[in-house]
Amino acid sequence: MSKFFVNVAPINNSNSSSSHTTTSSNTQRHQQHQQHYGGSGTTGHTMVARRLNYDLHGGTTSINNNNNIVIKNESVDLDYDHVLSSSDSNSNGGVAAHLRDHVYISLDKGHNTGAVATAAAAATAGHTQQQLQQQHHHQNQQQRKATGKSNDITNYYKVKRRPHAVSDEIHPKKQAKQSAHHQTVYQKHTASSAPQQLRHSHHQLRHDADAELDEDVVERVAKPASHHPFSLSTPQQQLAASVASSSSSGDRNRADTSLGILTKKFVDLLQESPDGVVDLNEASNRLHVQKRRIYDITNVLEGINILEKKSKNNIQWRCGQSMVSQERSRHIEADSLRLEQQENELNKAIDLMRENLAEISQEVENSGGMAYVTQNDLLNVDLFKDQIVIVIKAPPEAKLVLPNTKLPREIYVKAENSGEINVFLCHDTSPENSPIAPGAGYVGAPGAGCVRTATSTRLHPLTNQRLNDPLFNNIDAMSTKGLFQTPYRSARNLSKSIEEAAKQSQPEYNNICDIAMGQHHNLNQQQQQQQQQLLQQPEEDDVDVELNQLVPTLTNPVVRTHQFQQHQQPSIQELFSSLTESSPPTPTKRRREAAAAAIAAGSSTTATTTLNSHNNRNHSNHSNHSNHSSSNNSKSQPPTIGYGSSQRRSDVPMYNCAMEGATTTSATADTTAATSRSAAASSLQMQFAAVAESNNGSSSGGGGGGGGYGSIAGAGANADPHQPYSHDRNSLPPGVADCDANSNSSSVTLQGLDALFNDIGSDYFSNDIAFVSINPPDDNDYPYALNANEGIDRLFDFGSDAYGP
């Protein structure tokens, strides 16, 4: 509510009305003062209200010049507008108890001049005041009679009384604002023509005005005395002005009373407390702030679980006697020290890296911009020892991604602009680490100084020195994997391959048998000529030929012959590479019975070989061949051929492969001259070859001409005419041959059975079951895809156990 009052009665603009109102107002004020201070108690209580009147500086109210406006501070005596008359002793009668501390100023709507009017500072003469007082009293009585009790409460303005003096402190901003917009002019009330009886009342009026000046906040503007257009006449005014100026200059700043500073001070009080408990009343007194400010701090600290309320006005830290425990403080200090040390180490490392980078840059500049490393530089690094080093040359913007850091087996290099990426293998070419070393050939071979390869190392693991290279360390494990159980997929693939080869080879094999039965006489002469040509050639041990013999294919049987020791022996053996004996034993028994019958009947012999590859059972029989020779003519008796003991292996059935582990022997017997007829079937566009020799001779103690086996090596070709033979008497025993794929150029026994057949009908092979189909496993049992390369290691069995000493 405003501290100033404006005119509540409508002001008449006419000069006469204004002049009359001013005169009556001055008279009324003087009369009221005289009644109040002069001991007249018949009138009601009055209140001095301060109002600002804007009068023109010229003193004339008729001039409408607003440029010269002087603010006048006047004291106006106001009467309570009560229903009771002025003669009533109880002026508060009829006012409610809760409204007694207020002053109500009535608004007279029907009269031109109200109870409150503009007041002037000049005092009039005594007789004039007497008349005006009587006139004003008469007007008040008429007003009360007219209005009566009809005045509504809304017609009053409420003014709050001030039971206590206002504090001397004024905010600097408010004080500056008031000093800028208001200029209070103090005007002394002097009575030049007043009589002696009014001097005391005017002195009391000035004293009351000075008291009101001390109580009112708005009137105390911090200005020096020199700025006022008037001088302060009383000591009270000078004291008030000095207090106002000192309070304004020494006022505290807002930052001093902020919550942040108060919170710090409050925390200091908590730390000073021995048990961490602080009384809020004591804190408010020590900090010189209101208690609600302390509550603002404690509410926030309670919200973040730092404080807890112990009682009504006592709060305590939640962490106990100290805000931070000693152990936690030690941990914090240790962590801070450790982090500082790490920071120092990192700073040193960064400085070192910068120095190294500067040195490298300087070296590059000194070398003319050429920065490169050689292969030896990379291989000499200890980190890359015994490792495969790969050098990648990529554009600068290329990205290298390592998918799995735990198993760094793969890396991805990608160029953003599709630049060229070059990858180089940095390998060690020193002699001790080279995978190809000179001077390591076959033992005892002429080419001992040839290059040693991985194949020769695998075929000769016992006679050759092992390579010192990490790439060939597991060569034995690779070569012996055929010794383990064949997986389902390999077994199925092997069965499929055998079946397909059997279907392709069966018609041609039957055709060979028919030709051998019908044209065996013509073949005898051709085989004799081939045998003579082979005997004339020297024996050689060629490594390439040996490797070709040791690495056959599915349809390429290899037979290697050796020297036949006994000369002039009329033994004829016909060699055939045969299929695996996977058929039931019934056809085998039939062939054996037919061979025995043919030998007993003395028919011409026919050489054949029984399919016995990869079956490790040996059958050995001894048959005696009797050769009788005379001086005039020589006849050959049909030799007797028995089945020898052979080792059979039933793990992998095969057909049309090399023969192993069979021996045939021949002995001489003193019999009469007989004619020996031999027939051999040679391969026509197949992998079979035969050598036959027919000689007539007789010996009693072992002597005569020489004969031997011919070497059969080649796919779909006849007997090799270049295979060497020798006639040394101290050579190996007769009938020794090898065709195993695992052979290491040493003499092993010939696998298979050599049989001599005489007068066997052409319907023998048609009645006998030469081939038995191999049914592959069902696809439901082995749902795997076929692979033509699987089973090869198992088929040829490159195992280390097959090598002989």
Swiss-Prot record:
Q: Name one GO cellular component term.
A: RNA polymerase II transcription regulator complex
Annotated region (Disordered), positions in chain: 9-45, 119-208, 224-255, 578-650, 714-743
**Coordinates of motif PIP-box K+4 motif in the sequence?**
147-161
Point out the signal peptide segment.
Answer: none
Q: Which SMART domains match?
A: E2F_TDP (SM01372)
Give residue spans, biased composition: Low complexity: 12-37, 119-134, 240-249, 595-615, 623-636
> PANTHER family under this entry?
TRANSCRIPTION FACTOR E2F (PTHR12081), TRANSCRIPTION FACTOR E2F2-RELATED (PTHR12081:SF18)
* Name of the molecule in the record: Transcription factor E2f1
Protein's organism:
Drosophila melanogaster
Q: Which gene encodes it?
A: E2f1
